[in-house]
Amino acid sequence: MKVSVLITLAVLGVMFVWASAAELEERGSDQRDSPAWLKSMERIFRSEERECRKMFGGCSVDSDCCAHLGCKPTLKYCAWDGTFGK
């Protein structure tokens, strides 16, 4: 029973990908298809300068992270540094 459910889900997934690819090929993947507000949001996020990185944000040094967060050296992300207070 489990195998038949997995096979059915796999077939449905393949059919979805195939149908999406056919529709994309038919319409084309031109940038004019994307809404104008999406392009403006992309511009805003690219140009916005952030003060500090929040939890799990990428970093290179401790000063990149917000208060009470430190940059983990192995995976380079901001995580709680174990401190409390204001």
UniProtKB/Swiss-Prot annotation:
Residues 1-21 form the signal peptide. InterPro entries: Huwentoxin-1. One of its GO terms (cellular component) is extracellular region. The keyword Signal applies. Disulfide bonds join 52-66, 59-71, 65-78. One of its GO terms (molecular function) is ion channel inhibitor activity. It holds the Pfam family Toxin_12. Residues 22-50 form a propeptide. The modification Phenylalanine amide is found at residue 84. The keyword Isomerase does not apply. It is found in: Secreted. Expressed by the venom gland. Keywords: Amidation, Disulfide bond, Ion channel impairing toxin, Knottin, Potassium channel impairing toxin, Secreted, Signal, Toxin, Voltage-gated potassium channel impairing toxin, Voltage-gated sodium channel impairing toxin. Belongs to the neurotoxin 10 (Hwtx-1) family. 28 (Jztx-11) subfamily. This toxin acts as a voltage-dependent gating-modifier. It inhibits the sodium conductance (IC(50)=124 nM) and slows the fast inactivation (EC(50)=1180 nM) of Nav1.5/SCN5A. It significantly shifts the activation to more depolarized voltages and decreases the deactivation of Nav1.5 currents upon extreme depolarization, but only slightly affects voltage-dependence of steady-state inactivation. In addition, this toxin causes an approximately five-fold decrease in the rate of recovery from inactivation and an approximately 1.9-fold reduction in the closed-state inactivation rate. The presence of a 'disulfide through disulfide knot' structurally defines this protein as a knottin. Negative results: does not show effect on Kv1.1/KCNA1, Kv1.2/KCNA2, Kv1.3/KCNA3, Kv1.4/KCNA4, Kv3.1/KCNC1 (all expressed in oocytes), voltage-gated sodium channels (Nav1) (from DRG neurons), and in a range of voltage-gated calcium channels (expressed in rat DRG neurons). In addition, does not show significant toxic symptoms when injected into mice and into cockroaches. This is Kappa-theraphotoxin-Cg1a 3. It comes from Chilobrachys guangxiensis.
